[in-house]
A protein has these predicted regions:
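Short, charged/polar surface micro-motifs in flexible loops or helix N-caps
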Residues: 1, 38-41, 120
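N-terminal amphipathic, basic helical "cap/leader" segment at the start of enzyme domains
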Residues: 1-31, 139-140
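Glycine-rich, charged/polar anion/phosphate-binding loops
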Residues: 17-19, 99, 123
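Small-aliphatic-rich amphipathic alpha-helix that forms the alpha element of a beta-alpha
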Residues: 33, 39, 49, 53-100
């Protein structure tokens, strides 16, 4: 929490407030999961698929980011299905170097931190959802 509080002063008020809220989430959660991209696909994908490294770099880099994001989303859905609360703390990417120092320099690229625990207010249903028709557009 001190790391986040100390670092938050470098940012404007909205980001600073989100960083402090993130610190509280991390401190209060019984489990905190850090998602780190090991870069295996970028390193081995060009050999595996026998494609030119230069041409394939952007493709494999994008796939690594998408895979990490999908893993985090699946983690959030699984936690919710078990009655647990979780949150994807993307704001911590603003202080990723400090987070990596705190995590002990894991091998790979920092992608996300997800605190998991029991909701403080289980009766609170979360934000009201808008009708699907307002969010989805079908193309003919």
């Amino acid at each position: 929490a001190r790391m986040v509080t100390d670092s938050s002063v470098r940012f404007p008020r909205p980001a600073s407030a989100l960083l402090r809220m993130s610190a509280r989430s991390v401190l209060s959660a019984p489990v905190v999961i850090a998602v780190v991209n090991t870069g295996d696909l970028l390193r081995r994908g060009t050999d595996l698929f026998q494609v030119d490294k230069e041409a394939a770099h952007d493709f494999f880099r994008t796939m690594e980011i998408q895979s990490s994001a999908a893993a985090v989303e699946n983690l959030l859905l699984a936690a919710t299905s078990l009655g647990l609360g979780s949150v994807w703390l993307g704001i911590l990417f603003l202080i990723k170097d400090e987070v990596l120092d705190f995590l002990g320099e894991p091998t790979g690229e920092f992608m996300a931190v997800v605190p998991v625990g029991y909701p403080a207010r289980p009766e609170h249903p979360g934000p009201k959802k808008q009708p699907l028709e307002l969010k989805v557009r079908y193309l003919d």
